């Protein structure tokens, strides 16, 4: 049980334990999402990102930094060592296939590592590791990272599905964003 990080020692030609007992930091101030897809996001994702961008004066009461490396493995490593949350949510373009990332060879291995390191990994509506694959190419939404950020995202999705969430709003654009739909 647990997660340990190893680094290749090129001189010795072997991997050396450099990060024993990795634990994802509980508190975070970073999130990673491809903001160019904002116009396609579901309301729970818009709500979460809006709250993060509101900073100290917003409902999350701290300033967040947004990251996007566009490399799933690099993002997973950053979350493991620095904390934070990574979001590749289902959106208007990927809804019919269940998301964009491959469940079996992308989401499942990383979800297992994240949970072993004390974090969470969800689709937005449920735990990644609870999904029984229907086929080898199955796609999924994928949100992982510090539990303190994953849990509100799951709650927002459940509230949205139940019709009990608050509407997305922006002081400048009301229920729209900067990007046109």
Please describe what each predicted stretch is.
Residues 1-181:
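IMPase-like, lithium-sensitive Mg2+-dependent phosphomonoesterase catalytic core
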